[in-house]
């Protein structure tokens, strides 16, 4: 079953130098249980692609296409629904994991922390 899908995703930044395409026509899918790694040179759009998933891009970024999470279009979601998804179904660990993750705590505990803060569940289920 497809968990995450990009359909013709495009991100263009607009600034003093005009329009700059950062992501051009990405089509890919990730099924439940699969792992996806995105690699490339500095400035090729990896972070832009990841930030687009949770709509964390700056206001001057124009995003078109579709990003489907469990069949639901993240780009069409209202802010309330998006906020709920950010805490329960999707999250991001930014580049430089040494600054994002605590080296003296298990990763599972760190990933589970926001779930425990926002959901009624046990630590075992959250991890």
Predicted regions and their residues:
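ABC transporter nucleotide-binding domains
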Residues: 1-127
